[in-house]
């Protein structure tokens, strides 16, 4: 018996000695996915959630100030509704003691910004719009996708020139995002006035709408060459395209801030979905990491990766690198360190922060920005630009 006990003691000691570092990672670093995982914008939220989870897998155990941590993703479904987003961030901060997270939607940000300012929550904003979200009053808000201003300044003139378009119309959601982006594209159209380009009309719809006929009739009467659909999600733009073609529209659609799914558009709109130009979509992979993440997602979930996955993954890896170097989880100290850093390993290519001239603070991600056009149910390359934004 004594011999057996001694043998067991030796085995336990060996097990402790040979245990991997992760066995001692008793502390958890929580990061929130405050995103829609149900409803019409669910694909956006699932991409963010899975991007964070894949980043957590790859980060493994990391050390901050001599303590070992593992990242844990906590998801709060917002259904892309402002009231549910307010409830979600309150639950994350006050109930679950979460200090960091990804939050989707320019339209849901206005009511949560006071909470972010009060608590110092570090928000990776997956949101378009512009100065309403990114400004010196919100030093812990980092936009991890191209802003509306950045996208329109980068592409509005270029697309109109490439297509020879002269008349531009706008159809977007009736919220903070839509109203802001209509102003942005009007400003860009004004820059092209000397070249005969004009902005001919704007219409708005309530999110979740399915009948766009009346708004489209009013816009099509203005004979636009391009209808900009702003951040309309996949299901909405598919219906917009289908209904517009039925009403006789033969021009182009441009989708600036959403991340669209080609197959879903084709399933709904068929050939009517042709000639949708979408920004922020890569027809060809920009990096090896981009391809690896796409393949991992396909293998695990049996479907193509949602378009929000890569930017979220890159932001999470960048954040943990910064926290590790800073040696603290203090969000204000981390925000300062993050703003002064760059990141070479983003899935889209080298990344940094800009926007100081435009927004008064460096909290706008600067990464390569692609544009693709839908042809025969698949994205084809249209253009790639640097995304430089001062």
Predicted regions and their residues:
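N-terminal signal peptide c-region/cleavage motif recognized by signal peptidases
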Residues: 18-20
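Extracytosolic ligand-binding ectodomains
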Residues: 2-12, 24-390
């Amino acid at each position: 018996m004594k011999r057996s006990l001694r043998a067991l003691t030796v085995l336990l000691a060996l097990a402790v000695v040979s245990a991997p570092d992760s066995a001692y990672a008793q502390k958890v670093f929580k990061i929130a996915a405050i995103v829609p995982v149900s409803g019409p914008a669910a694909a956006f939220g699932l991409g963010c959630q899975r991007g964070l989870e894949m980043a957590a897998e790859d980060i493994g155990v990391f050390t901050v100030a001599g303590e070992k941590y593992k990242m844990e993703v906590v998801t709060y479904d917002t259904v892309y509704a402002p009231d549910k987003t307010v409830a979600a961030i309150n639950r994350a901060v006050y109930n679950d003691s979460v200090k960091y997270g990804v939050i989707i939607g320019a339209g849901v940000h206005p009511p949560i910004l006071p909470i972010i300012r009060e608590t110092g929550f570090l928000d990776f904003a997956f949101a378009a719009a512009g100065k309403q979200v990114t400004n010196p009053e919100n030093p812990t808000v980092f936009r991890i996708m191209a802003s509306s201003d950045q996208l329109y300044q980068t592409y509005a003139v270029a697309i109109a020139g490439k297509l020879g378009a002269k008349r531009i119309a706008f159809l977007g959601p009736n919220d903070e995002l839509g109203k802001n982006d209509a102003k942005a594209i009007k400003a860009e159209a004004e820059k092209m006035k000397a070249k005969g380009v004009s902005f001919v009309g704007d219409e708005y719809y309530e999110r979740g709408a399915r009948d766009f006929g009346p708004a489209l009739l009013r816009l099509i009467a203005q004979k636009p060459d391009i209808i900009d659909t702003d951040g309309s999600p996949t299901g909405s733009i598919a219906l917009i395209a289908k209904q517009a073609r039925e009403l006789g529209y033969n021009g182009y659609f441009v989708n600036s801030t959403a991340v669209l799914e080609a197959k879903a558009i084709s399933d709904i709109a068929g050939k009517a979905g042709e000639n949708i130009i979408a920004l922020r979509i890569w027809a060809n992979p920009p990096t090896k990491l981009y391809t690896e993440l796409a393949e991992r997602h396909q293998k695990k979930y049996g479907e193509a990766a949602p378009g929000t996955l890569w930017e979220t993954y890159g932001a999470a890896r960048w954040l943990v690198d910064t926290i590790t170097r800073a040696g603290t989880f203090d969000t204000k100290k981390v925000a300062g360190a993050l703003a002064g850093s760059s990141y070479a390993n983003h899935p889209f290519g080298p990344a940094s922060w800009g926007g100081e001239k435009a927004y008064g603070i460096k909290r706008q991600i600067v990464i390569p920005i692609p544009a693709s056009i839908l042809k025969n149910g698949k994205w084809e390359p249209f253009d790639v630009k640097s995304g430089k934004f001062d």
